Amino acid sequence: MQEQYRPEEIESKVQLHWDEKRTFEVTEDESKEKYYCLSMLPYPSGRLHMGHVRNYTIGDVVARYQRMLGKNVLQPIGWDAFGLPAEGAAVKNNTAPAPWTYDNIAYMKNQLKTLGFGYDWSREIATCTPEYYRWEQKFFTELYKKGLVYKKTSAVNWCPNDQTVLANEQVIDGCCWRCDTKVERKEIPQWFIKITAYADELLRDLDKLDHWPDTVKTMQRNWIGRSEGVEITFDVKGYDNTLTVYTTRPDTFMGATYLAVAAGHPLAQKAAANNAELAAFIDECRNTKVAEAEMATMEKKGVDTGFKATHPLTGEEIPVWAANFVLMEYGTGAVMAVPGHDQRDYEFASKYGLTIKPVILAADGSEPDLSEQALTEKGVLFNSGEFDGLAFEAAFNAIADKLAEKGVGERKVNYRLRDWGVSRQRYWGAPIPMVTLEDGTVLPTPEDQLPVILPEDVVMDGITSPIKADPEWAKTTVNGMPALRETDTFDTFMESSWYYARYTCPQYQEGMLDSKAANYWLPVDIYIGGIEHAIMHLLYFRFFHKLMRDAGMVTSDEPAKQLLCQGMVLADAFYYVGENGERNWVSPVDAIVERDEKGRIVKAKDAAGHELVYTGMSKMSKSKNNGIDPQVMVERYGADTVRLFMMFASPADMTLEWQESGVEGANRFIKRVWKLVYEHTAKGPVAALNVDALSEDQKALRRDVHKTIAKVTDDIGRRQTFNTAIAAIMELMNKLAKAPQEGEQDRALLQEALQAVVRMLNPFTPHVCFTLWQELGGEGDIDNAPWPVADEQAMVENTTLVVVQVNGKVRGKITVAVDATEEQVRERAGQEHLVAKYLDGVTVRKVIYVPGKLLNLVVG
């Protein structure tokens, strides 16, 4: 064994060994308990960032630990390879998205290997390959036949200059990112999957997810947004149709003083024909983004349509307004307004001088003061005719029943969740497998024509999708009849909604999944990824699992038993102000800093002499230039050091502050372990450990070893507090470094301890542990070694610490045998000099003894 720890030599050698031995390749084995450990697959952007490294290190630690417990562990990896960034990069680099993507995959795969992640590379998937997306296309056609897929018009961002659809990210301050033209909202036909058909089950089954963070479950509950209410129909004078609204507060119905419809509603469109102000308003709304966050804060505007609706219970005529806060995509595109008891309705009514009628009493029974705001709390009705005096629930039921009796209302359960729009007017995605015949009939692509392959050898102009620009690509025949292919592609959330299941059978050619393999491995035991995916990916992931279950492919109801959301990685951020007042962000690597005595940054400059402004720690990002390149750190310290720091610096679900001093500390610790093993093995063969022959000091050290094994096992396995597991190993290492190493049993005990330490560290620092295990004479590869088991007998305490008080004040602590009598404890206390001086020349009047814990001597 060489004296110096040289990670650059060890790591490449161990990685080659894993590759050659195919150490982490697994197959189904009914005789073993399975464990499926999965980290969210990366987008091949070009280089790994520290967020990736943290995510995948957590996954690898869990997988290696479970493997050492003797389980059959699947840990696969792949690439979420379709998406908009590839199109932008292709235009910028004058290439096509496919070669750019495949080059990035090759580069990042090598990066993952240098970090020593124990993946089963035989199961690698790239979602942009026809071998993968063909099954997604086939499944989509089956969902269409089941009635779970439909097409309808929906609003998109449209650039009138480029004549193209823009993604939300391509709209900058309401203008096209390329040509700065004002972006419009345009209705175009798009494909949808009926996720709403599963809304109730998606909501209900959240209760089964005991090992998912409550924050994620709450976000999904709110996103699904189940509500119980009443759907009410209004007659409108001079309009051919009725208006239908939904309300969760029918108790306030007698206070409805106007209706509001979306600018795109047919009623508003009809009214606009003779109303120039309304027509201009509708035009303005067409260019308004409809993101919910913006809807909440934007100014509420409207125009009176001139139509009057009849209140079904009072017979009063109430005005119908077109308003920018009502969306056609939500509900019926019309809402009932009760300004006395809804703040948004109140602000709108106040702005336009509309009637505000209170119908709910304040909590103290008085009429509410509506001079400044609406009363939104529930309460007792007044001003409501026959319903006066009823509280919320009774009023809800009475008014709902009355509306039903008159044939103008029915109770409804509503969901905030909308069907999933899967059409994207982009090129780099899986083609949607639908065709349109010359007579307008829409059909799924026949199975013998699947997959519909996306051409990869294309020229990107940055404006139009190559498959939209090429009329020949769309031409096909179905049953001998000419047809045109759909030129939209799938939302990339489609690919990431089922990849975890395909990992169980990536080479299977008979269908989307091999049910036998899928049901052996699924559900995933632990899924690791960022909380930013809480409502989009993680909801579609659950939805797709239920779709596959109902297609007979899987038997479980949910895709993953446990979800671990890792925290973000933060780093110092610095900038200097340029000549034009702009902020120039400087990498923390290039910042020369001065710190105060507490280690806080007080001054900073860069190599060019710019005085830097320090903004504190923030998420590593390109925009602040504060990302740390993992590759540079691996080359400087080794992968094991980077991994150890990542797991030690913070609990897995909390933010991690990148500090190079902490990385150096992790490196020093590995060197200490290396040094101790080197010194130990240099002394030659070790005798067998004889636990019966150990001295009290040796037994105490062995007790520490086995207590550490028990703690680390619990910290990794049950609590998943990986940082405290590492801290416990570090504490034990400090004791081992100070322990005697000369006697035969000293060395035998150290051998047992070091073999345990190396196995406990193996999930975190697998390269160095692989090497040290061999040096310590461990059997076989450490990758196949069992996890150390704590010896219960060794952990039994034969001594205990007793606190000694004199007149209730702590005067000392003594170590006594666990079975010591009160007399023996008193005698031992009297020998303790810190205690003895308080007993000199006084009489002990009373003794209070709590066995094994406390001795209080009352003196006078």
UniProtKB/Swiss-Prot annotation:
Keywords: Aminoacyl-tRNA synthetase, ATP-binding, Cytoplasm, Ligase, Nucleotide-binding, Protein biosynthesis
GO biological process: leucyl-tRNA aminoacylation
GO MF annotation terms: aminoacyl-tRNA deacylase activity; ATP binding; leucine-tRNA ligase activity
Family matches, as Gene3D superfamilies: 2.20.28.290, 3.10.20.590, HUPs, Isoleucyl-tRNA Synthetase, Domain 1, Valyl/Leucyl/Isoleucyl-tRNA synthetase, editing domain
UniProt: ATP binding residues: K622
GO cellular component: cytosol
Localisation: Cytoplasm
Main subcellular location: cytoplasm
SUPFAM superfamilies named in the record: Anticodon-binding domain of a subclass of class I aminoacyl-tRNA synthetases, Nucleotidylyl transferase, ValRS/IleRS/LeuRS editing domain
Catalyzed chemical reaction(s): tRNA(Leu) + L-leucine + ATP = L-leucyl-tRNA(Leu) + AMP + diphosphate
PROSITE patterns: AA_TRNA_LIGASE_I (PS00178)
This enzyme's EC code(s): 6.1.1.4
Family: Belongs to the class-I aminoacyl-tRNA synthetase family.
Protein name per UniProt: Leucine--tRNA ligase
Organism for this UniProt entry: Salmonella enteritidis PT4 (strain P125109)
Lineage: Bacteria, Pseudomonadati, Pseudomonadota, Gammaproteobacteria, Enterobacterales
Gene this protein is translated from: leuS
